[in-house]
Each structure stands twice: as structure tokens, then as C-alpha cells.
């Protein structure tokens, strides 16, 4: 069953004819994703990668029946692209763009309330259900269909968890990169809730990092959830000094909050198995499942 996307998901690309949109759409098509068109204002009526181009998301949705969109649009214009997709009623919107102004994302968060749209990202690698649907920039070949749900704030650490769970023979049900910005569309709790309710997902890997309280909120949710599944977590930034931003805009220990130790403590108290090395994620999960 997986979560959010599958082989029936119809995907359009906003920023379709740009270099990033072109490259990653080619990769998605080669993977088997059901790409049905793209949006580039002013180029409607033409074709690109043998798919139709539309001027607006409304038009693309009406003509193709798309229920998902991936956004490869520069930071100054990305929020408007998300808002257009929300307005068109696209169900899954994946925004890859890094560097969207925080106030722009606050506007987007407000527009999401009461809408039918779920936003993944921004500043994320995207979402993939192996062998079915790849939306984003992750390397498809490292994924294998399996039973581990992966949710992560970090792109490259997601790939590390994927490669390791593939190597030990577990595979993945769905992998979601929620992004490293302070304001995003989908959080750990949203994804863990879906994974807990998904029959195909037998266990969960959660990769967090310093900054914010998303991991603490997830720990609280896990602790009080009636459904229980094995969960392994790694938190990046254990050695990070307070006040220093570590890569992502949201990865900063500020006001004495958001340290790795706080997060690890909260997760451990919720019954989550912790690994302190990213190299041990797959092995830790395999050992946990083999009991």
C-alpha cells in the first residue's frame, strides 16, 4: 500500500522546461513515474520530453487529471508556485527548492489550512515509493521495494538509510524527505502517523537533526500512539556548537533548545531505538527486527 504516492499517481512538473525540471523529470520518467505534463508560463501548447506544456497548474490539472506536482522553481518565485498548486487543488505538492524566504513559507502554511493539499518540503529531496513512483531528486537505483518507512529532515542521510536498508535486504515501503527549513509542509508526526497505519510498513526509520522541536513532538506522538511499530532514529549534529547553523536553515540550536541530546533523550523515553552513527542505521534496524 505504501503512503502518499504509488504507481497510479499522476505527476506534473512546475518549472518543467528549466534545467533542473528537465533533468529530474527525465529521471522520474525513466524510473517509471507517471509524469503527465508540465507547467511553464508562456510555453503552453508546446511539448517537452514528449509531454504537453501548460501555462497554468489549473489547466494542467483539468487536461491531465494530475493529483501531484513537483516544483523546480527558483526561491523568489517558489512560494507562488506552491500557492498556485494549492489553489488548483493538487493533492500532493513536492517542493525541492532551497532558500525560500521564511515569510513566503508562512503565507504558504496559512494557505494550506483547510485546503486539500499536502505539501512535502520545501528544501527536500522529495518522496519515493520504490518501483512505483519517484517525485524528486533522490537516486532511484538505491531503492528496493520493502517494509521500512523512512522519514528524514536530511536528504543525503535519507539516501544513506535507504542504501543500508537495501543492503541488509529490508527495502523500503515509502521514503519521505520532509526538508530542512524552519517552516515546512509535512512534519515527522504526519509521516509517522501514516506509516503506523500502513499495513505494508513494518518498521520506521526517522532521521532528525538539531534545531526546532519536530523530533520532540514526534517522540511525544510515538509515546502516546496506540499503534506500535519498531522505530530507529538517528539525530545529526551531536557535536554542533550552540548558535551555529549547520547546513540547513532550520539546523540551529537557539535559546538553549534544539540540541541533539535533548532530542535523543525524548526519543529514547518514547521507546525509540537510537543509533549514534549514520553508518549503523541499517544494521540497527535489522538487529531490532530480528530481536
From Swiss-Prot:
InterPro entries: Cit_synth/succinyl-CoA_lig_AS, Citrt_syn/SCS-alpha_CS, CoA-bd, CoA_lig_alpha, NAD(P)-bd_dom_sf, SUCC_ACL_C, Succinyl-CoA_synth-like. GO terms for biological process: tricarboxylic acid cycle. This is Succinate--CoA ligase [ADP-forming] subunit alpha. Substrate binds at residue 159. GO terms for molecular function: nucleotide binding; succinate-CoA ligase (ADP-forming) activity; succinate-CoA ligase (GDP-forming) activity. PROSITE patterns: SUCCINYL_COA_LIG_1, SUCCINYL_COA_LIG_2. Pfam families: CoA_binding (PF02629), Ligase_CoA (PF00549). Heterotetramer of two alpha and two beta subunits. SUPFAM superfamilies: NAD(P)-binding Rossmann-fold domains, Succinyl-CoA synthetase domains. The keyword Amino-acid biosynthesis does not apply. GO terms for cellular component: succinate-CoA ligase complex (ADP-forming). Pathway: Carbohydrate metabolism; tricarboxylic acid cycle; succinate from succinyl-CoA (ligase route): step 1/1. SMART domains: CoA_binding (SM00881). The active site is at residue 248. Belongs to the succinate/malate CoA ligase alpha subunit family. It catalyses: succinate + ATP + CoA = succinyl-CoA + ADP + phosphate; GTP + succinate + CoA = succinyl-CoA + GDP + phosphate. Its EC number is 6.2.1.5. CoA binds at residues 17-20, 43, 96-98. It is an enzyme of class 6 (ligase). The keyword Nucleotide-binding applies. Keywords: Ligase, Nucleotide-binding, Tricarboxylic acid cycle. Succinyl-CoA synthetase functions in the citric acid cycle (TCA), coupling the hydrolysis of succinyl-CoA to the synthesis of either ATP or GTP and thus represents the only step of substrate-level phosphorylation in the TCA. The alpha subunit of the enzyme binds the substrates coenzyme A and phosphate, while succinate binding and nucleotide specificity is provided by the beta subunit.
Amino acid at each position: 500500500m505504501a503512503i502518499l504516492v504509488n504507481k497510479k499517481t499522476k505527476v506534473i512538473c512546475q518549472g518543467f522546461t528549466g534545467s533542473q525540471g528537465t533533468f529530474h523529470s527525465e529521471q522520474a520518467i525513466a524510473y517509471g513515474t507517471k509524469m503527465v505534463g508540465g507547467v511553464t508560463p508562456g510555453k503552453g501548447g508546446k511539448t517537452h520530453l514528449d509531454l504537453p506544456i501548460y501555462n497554468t497548474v489549473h489547466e494542467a490539472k483539468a487536461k491531465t487529471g494530475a493529483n501531484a506536482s513537483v516544483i523546480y522553481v527558483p526561491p523568489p518565485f517558489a512560494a507562488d508556485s506552491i500557492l498556485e498548486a494549492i489553489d488548483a487543488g493538487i493533492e500532493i505538492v513536492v517542493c525541492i527548492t532551497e532558500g525560500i524566504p521564511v515569510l513566503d513559507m508562512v503565507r504558504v502554511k496559512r494557505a494550506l489550512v483547510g485546503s486539500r493539499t499536502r505539501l512535502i518540503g520545501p528544501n527536500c529531496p522529495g518522496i519515493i515509493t520504490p518501483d512505483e513512483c519517484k517525485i524528486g531528486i533522490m537516486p532511484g537505483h538505491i531503492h528496493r521495494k520493502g517494509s521500512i518507512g523512512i522519514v528524514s529532515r536530511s536528504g543525503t542521510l535519507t539516501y544513506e538509510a535507504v542504501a543500508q536498508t537495501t543492503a541488509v535486504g529490508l527495502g523500503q515501503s515509502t521514503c519521505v524527505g520532509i526538508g530542512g527549513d524552519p517552516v515546512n509542509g509535512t512534519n515527522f508526526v504526519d509521516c509517522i502517523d501514516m506509516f503506523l497505519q500502513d499495513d505494508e510498513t513494518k518498521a520506521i526509520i526517522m532521521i532528525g537533526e538539531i534545531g526546532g522541536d519536530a523530533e520532540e513532538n514526534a517522540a511525544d506522538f510515538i509515546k502516546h500512539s496506540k499503534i506500535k511499530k519498531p522505530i530507529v532514529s538517528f539525530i545529526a549534529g551531536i557535536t554542533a556548537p550552540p548558535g551555529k547553523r549547520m547546513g540547513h536553515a532550520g539546523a540551529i540550536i537557539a535559546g538553549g533548545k534544539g540540541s541533539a541530546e535533548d532530542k535523543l533523550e525524548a526519543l529514547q523515553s518514547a521507546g525509540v531505538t537510537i543509533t549514534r552513527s549514520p553508518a549503523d542505521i541499517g544494521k540497527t534496524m535489522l538487529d531490532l527486527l530480528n530481536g
